[in-house]
Design a protein with these regions (language model features):
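ATP-dependent small-molecule kinase catalytic core of the GHMP/sugar-kinase superfamily
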Residues: 90, 97-158, 162-166
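A glycine-rich beta-to-alpha transition motif near the start of alpha/beta enzyme domains, typified by
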Residues: 1-110, 155-169
């Protein structure tokens, strides 16, 4: 069986996108894990599915990590989906509904931007496994600043790029 998909890249992340408006497919964790595998599948960081809504220029997007779990908003993935939908429907603005909330997207001079909203800094909103100061999280020799923009992020400030080589992620 042929299953149509779109493969897109955004700032170092790659995505497999299924347009469930035009070609609905059933996707479960097992399917997502299989197609996300870089050796045995297509390979990606996340799988995104576009769902229809009753509101014009609104689209629902479900986002899944490569382990099959549903996740909150991803800015790079949202921009990729918005770019695809804007080209498909000749739009310059649209709204994407995610489990993290509504994400307004615009296109100006062929550049797609998304308003991810305000960052969340409370350890429970990120979420971290235990209560701690999110503005000073120790990662071996580095200090991180933790926040959520729909999914968890850790920001590490460095004096110079040479320090990047010492960072073992």
């Amino acid at each position: 069986m042929k299953i149509p998909f779109i493969k897109m890249h955004g700032l170092g992340n790659d995505f497999i996108i299924f347009d469930n408006i035009d070609n609905p497919i059933i996707h479960d964790a097992k399917f997502i894990i299989k197609i996300s595998n870089r050796r045995l599948g297509i390979g990606c960081d996340q799988v995104l599915t576009i769902e229809n809504t009753d509101i014009h220029e609104n689209f629902k997007v479900k986002m899944y990590n490569s382990n099959g779990s549903e996740t909150g908003a991803c800015g790079n993935g949202t921009r990729c989906v918005a770019d695809y939908l804007m080209k498909r429907d000749n739009l310059y603005s649209l709204n994407i509904e995610s489990i993290s909330g509504n994400l307004p997207c615009t296109k100006v001079d062929n550049v797609v931007t998304v308003n991810m909203g305000k960052p969340k800094f409370d350890w429970e909103d990120i979420p971290l496994s235990n209560e701690q100061n999110t503005q000073n999280v120790s990662l071996d020799e580095f200090e991180a600043f933790c926040l959520s923009m729909g999914n968890p992020h850790a920001v590490i400030f460095m004096e110079n790029l040479d320090q990047l080589e010492r960072l073992d992620l």
